[in-house]
Amino acid sequence: MSEAANSLLLERAGLPEDLRWLAQKYPRENWQGHTNIHGLANMWLQRHDMFRELGGMLTNGIGDYREGRLTAPDFARWFAPRLNHFLGHLDGHHNVEDYQYFPAFAKAEPRLQRGFEILDADHHTIHEGLERNAEAANAFIRTLEESEDRQRFAADAYADENSRLIAMLKRHLADEEDLIIPLILDRGDRALVADDD
């Protein structure tokens, strides 16, 4: 993926209108009251909330370090396991979506195929962002035994990379929910899984 793909994801204001017909039928503010919210839809939303929460924790953690509220050793002990959890689970989640759920959902509702292609392209862009994030984080962690100036420079570089990743992720998660949750509400998760057989 290129910087252009990065930019498209970051600049997108939401799904194209022609893919929002189910989202208009099932507005976000009504999801929790729908009978089909349990099961797959609820799991999807909880998983996405977890990614938002972990992303926020990483952003706040690097902010705490940069503001001097955490020492370098304390930050490293706190940061590394959370970053690994975030990156690993996000990548695994995207793989399950790309190879299991998206094909089943596109088969169940072919009019949304282009939406799943957009989400798949997002996953590739986000995966590259994950790799850049991990590289910047590792570079930062390596500087924790070096001069304070090098630590600050590396922390700033990581914070910039993290900000880009979190911005892409927020846009993608919202668009994915706007495409998938209304489909699940409309059809029910059992019908969607059964369509994959």
State each model region's role.
Residues 1-197:
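Small-residue-biased structural context
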